[in-house]
Amino acid sequence: MILSDKDIFNYVTSKRVLIEPFNSKFVGPCSYDVTLGSEFIKYNEDVYDVKKTLNHSKFKIENSVMVCPLNHHLDETIIKNYKEKYNVDCVVSGGLLGTTNEYVELPNDVCAQYQGRSSFGRVFLQTHQTAGWIDSGFKGKITLEIVAYDKPVILYKNQRVGQLIFSKTLSPADIGYSDRKCSKYAGQTSVMASLIKKDFETNEEE
């Protein structure tokens, strides 16, 4: 059962679902809009060996970041020109990890799904690849996997980037996501790189 706007207000007001910060203007008919945070991760790898720790750089923006397609040529001169012309803090190509401003806590009988905004789809930018599912009992910020597929796209801190759709489960989970010892991303409060290498250290699922 998907929660409606009325349900979302009721769940937040009763503190069954935590969304911090919460903005009533971001409540849709059956969703809640979330906004882009200021922290990002860019991988520094030619090959992703998922058995190893992936080398990456973390950075913050004051205002905006330009995300370019992977095959978009960038050098120091082009990056400098882009920054000056478009007044952006950073210019990157390829995939970029980001995070929401919103910290979310779900009870054991509510799960959620993240979807990117259709307006971004119309400029061929995705803000998640496969990690749109949020298990019941999750606590943390939502990781964004950002890729531009056509032209460079400028994203701005605090702008709406996607929406959460909440669903009520038939029965509560015995053990919520954040209470499972093997949960890799429980309680994340900033952008986190992939911890997939831990799959080879345990037989349990994330």
Swiss-Prot record:
Give the multimer and partner information: Homotrimer.
The broad enzyme category this protein falls into is hydrolase
Put simply, this protein is called dCTP deaminase, dUMP-forming
Q: Which PANTHER family match?
A: DCTP DEAMINASE
Q: Which Pfam families match?
A: DCD
Q: Which reaction does it catalyse?
A: dCTP + 2 H2O = dUMP + NH4(+) + diphosphate
Per UniProt, which keywords does this protein have? Answer: Hydrolase, Nucleotide metabolism, Nucleotide-binding
Q: Which GO terms describe its biological process?
A: dUMP biosynthetic process; dUTP biosynthetic process
In which organism is this protein found? Methanococcus maripaludis (strain DSM 14266 / JCM 13030 / NBRC 101832 / S2 / LL)
General function of this protein: Bifunctional enzyme that catalyzes both the deamination of dCTP to dUTP and the hydrolysis of dUTP to dUMP without releasing the toxic dUTP intermediate.
Single Gene Ontology MF annotation: dCTP deaminase activity
Q: Family membership, please give it.
A: Belongs to the dCTP deaminase family.
Which residues are catalytic?
A: E145
Pathway participation? Pyrimidine metabolism; dUMP biosynthesis; dUMP from dCTP: step 1/1
Q: What is its EC number?
A: 3.5.4.30
**Which residues are recorded as binding dCTP?**
R117, S118, S119, F120, G121, R122, D135, T143, L144, E145, Q163, Y177, K184, Q188
N-terminal signal peptide: none
Residues flagged as site, Important for bifunctional activity: G132, W133
